Amino acid sequence: MQTRNTFSWIKEQITRSISVSLMIYIITRTSISNAYPIFAQQGYENPREATGRIVCANCHLANKPVDIEVPQAVLPDTVFEAVVRIPYDMQMKQVLANGKRGALNVGAVLILPEGFELAPPDRISPEMKEKIGNLSFQNYRPTKKNILVIGPVPGQKYSEITFPILSPDPATKKDVHFLKYPIYVGGNRGRGQIYPDGSKSNNTVYNATAAGIVSKIIRKEKGGYEITIADASDGRQVVDIIPPGPELLVSEGESIKLDQPLTSNPNVGGFGQGDAEIVLQDPLRIQGLLFFLSSVILAQIFLVLKKKQFEKVQLSEMNF
């Protein structure tokens, strides 16, 4: 009897462990599929390559514009706005993972100079919080607080993203200096064409993997196609699988060439990158400049007064 109870207890524990593991897997998989910045975070230690290219372009193949606006100069330990604009036609719809059409999402990566970081909530003004909305920013790495990522978020609401940034203070951070620094940004709208493992998404064009005659086209129940190509040279048959989403361009009996497009290109999004410069200004330099300008103005005033006094003396001598 005791052996049977022990066996039941072990069986219950194993079942519970499997259930917990399955739940963790589902949650993890869902978060990865819904948050594409994590692809870059998992695959690259730094999102900006030595060539200056931001790695998001490896998956988002189309080139689109992006714009960044930052102040020309900031003082130490100051919160300022870095505004990233990701423009696109709001009427456009993209191909979703299930092959249906839907609205575009946007995402961005902001690469700040060393020492600059996301401003803490208690330092952000109410006006800036209103511009930020419900956005949640995260660091690219726990050790890289100067690199921020956001997305995917609804493009119709957040085609303009405001990052709250805290400038460093050289008085407390000895590796930071009063200099001009570059800021780099990358922004995408819509889904990518290639996954990090090199496989294609359904948001791209599919080409023929062999030359020959299209002998059979099967429309799959859940969408997509199976295209059978009979190779004219050796008679072998090649089957190309088309996922749901792209529109078919070929028909049965048609002669096709190697790498000829079998589908349209459904992609309406793309990725772009840009840069800006910002000066970490020394307050003492500003004070010195103000003192210099004040001295110049006072000197001009004294010159004018001296000139008028001299003219009065000349006039009195002439009258005498």
UniProtKB/Swiss-Prot annotation:
Residues in the signal sequence: 1-35
Protein name stated in the entry: Cytochrome f
Origin: domain of life: Eukaryota
GO CC, alphabetical: chloroplast thylakoid membrane
Its job: Component of the cytochrome b6-f complex, which mediates electron transfer between photosystem II (PSII) and photosystem I (PSI), cyclic electron flow around PSI, and state transitions.
UniProt xrefs under HAMAP family: Cytb6_f_cytF
Entry GO MF terms: electron transfer activity; heme binding; iron ion binding
UniProt topology in membrane: Single-pass membrane protein
Subcellular locations according to the entry: Plastid, Chloroplast thylakoid membrane
Keyword Cytoplasm (UniProt): no
Subunit structure: The 4 large subunits of the cytochrome b6-f complex are cytochrome b6, subunit IV (17 kDa polypeptide, petD), cytochrome f and the Rieske protein, while the 4 small subunits are PetG, PetL, PetM and PetN. The complex functions as a dimer.
Cofactor binding note: Binds 1 heme group covalently.
